[in-house]
Swiss-Prot record:
A GO cellular component annotation in the UniProt record: cytosol
InterPro entries noted in UniProt: AAA+_ATPase, DNA_recomb/repair_RecA, DNA_recomb/repair_RecA_CS, P-loop_NTPase, RecA-like_C, RecA-like_N, RecA_ATP-bd, RecA_C_sf
Cross-referenced SMART domains: AAA (SM00382)
Organism: Rickettsia peacockii (strain Rustic)
UniProt-listed NCBIfam families: tigrfam_recA (TIGR02012)
Name assigned to this protein: Protein RecA
Leader sequence segment: none
Family, similarity comment: Belongs to the RecA family.
GO biological process, one term: DNA repair
Positions that bind ATP: G66, P67, E68, S69, S70, G71, K72, T73
Length: 343
């Protein structure tokens, strides 16, 4: 078959597909209107850099998992606040029935515009999510959490009844149904997940996430968040030191890490990240306990410098801008072969 005949055959096939399934159902990749991946900031400067595109990608599934009280919900509330700043409409499926509106407001969430649902069953939660995504009016939807998506059969059954893999089947079926809608509507879909321990594991990590393996495959980005220490003011604990690892990333190189402070009552400390990344990139000078910017001392001790940056937002914004410009120099990639995922 000559090249001309091939082109005619392909054109006829494409015309037939478009006639059957509508215009735009098949095309050459270069003809797609959005080639570049759009992103929404996570509210963490370090995590935005670690993700490689400046935040979480639009039209993709994101999984955020970690131990209890590690900052999972805090991170998702920052995501909502950032999406709302860009004029986005967000929804929160609160399957755990534990969302605190006062805390969400402190983190910058416009609670008057946030759509919330507190479903009774896993099927109901995922059907609500599906309807909202298909509406094309939602920019971001949070499902908190996968562990709380209890199948109807389990709720209606007796305590102690065996429900073998019913939640995993529910998640697998839902994700098959949701994936196309999420991509078509450009909706960011974030699943919060919990960690469980596998019994009888002799080698490797015994940790696993709930809901089976489907979410691991369908997620474009998987973020592991851990509390690694406490922040104290004298004897009082005022926050948590947090480490985040991007364990899977389909839009940029994975296995990058970021550290930030989560302050109780106010969320992720932007100023703390600016100090740490500024020092790492030689934008802020550190000599002993003193910090300087452009040869001017801005404070002694990290907490005092954080306060200085809060009081001088123009300097904070200036340093942040330089950090983002130099962010390509950060190469904190941990290629741990035992944690690599091939999917």
């Amino acid at each position: 078959m000559s090249n001309t005949d091939k082109e005619r055959a392909i054109a006829a096939a494409l015309a037939q597909i478009e006639k059957s399934y509508g215009k735009g159902s098949v095309m050459k990749l270069g003809q797609r209107p959005h080639v570049d991946i759009e992103a929404v900031s996570t509210g963490s400067l370090g995590l935005d850099i670690a993700l490689g595109i400046g935040g979480v990608p639009k039209g993709r599934i994101i999984e955020i998992f970690g131990p209890e009280s590690s900052g999972k919900t805090t991170l998702t509330l920052h995501l909502i606040a950032e999406a709302q700043k860009k004029g986005g409409t967000c929804a929160f499926i609160d399957a755990e029935h534990a969302l605190d509106p006062a805390y969400a407001k402190k983190l910058g969430v416009n609670i008057a515009e946030l759509i919330i649902s507190q479903p009774d069953t896993g099927e109901q939660a995922l059907e609500i999510a599906d309807t909202l995504i298909r509406s094309s009016g939602i920019d971001m939807i949070i499902i908190d959490s996968v562990a709380a998506l209890v199948p109807k059969s389990e709720i209606e059954g007796e305590m102690g009844d065996a429900q073998m893999a019913s939640q995993a089947r529910l998640m697998s079926q839902a994700l098959r149904k949701l994936t196309a809608s999420i991509n078509r509507t450009n909706c960011i879909t974030v699943f919060i997940n919990q960690i469980r321990m596998k019994i009888g594991v002799m080698f490797g990590s015994p940790e696993t996430t709930t809901g089976g393996n489907a979410l691991k495959f369908y997620a474009s980005v998987r973020i592991d968040i851990r509390r690694i220490g406490s922040i104290k003011d004298k004897e009082e604990v005022i926050g948590s030191q947090t480490k985040v690892k991007v364990v899977k990333n389909k839009v940029s190189p994975p296995f990058k890490t970021a550290d930030f402070d989560i302050m109780y009552g106010s969320g992720i400390s932007k100023e703390g990240e600016i100090i740490d990344l500024g020092v790492k990139l030689d934008i802020v000078e550190k000599s002993g306990s003193w910090f300087s910017y452009k040869n001017v001392r801005i404070g002694q001790g990290r907490e005092n410098v954080k306060q200085y940056l809060k009081e001088h937002p123009q300097i904070s914004n200036e340093i942040e801008k330089i950090i983002r410009e130099k962010s390509s120099k950060i190469t904190n990639i941990n290629l741990d072969q035992t944690e690599e995922e091939n999917d």
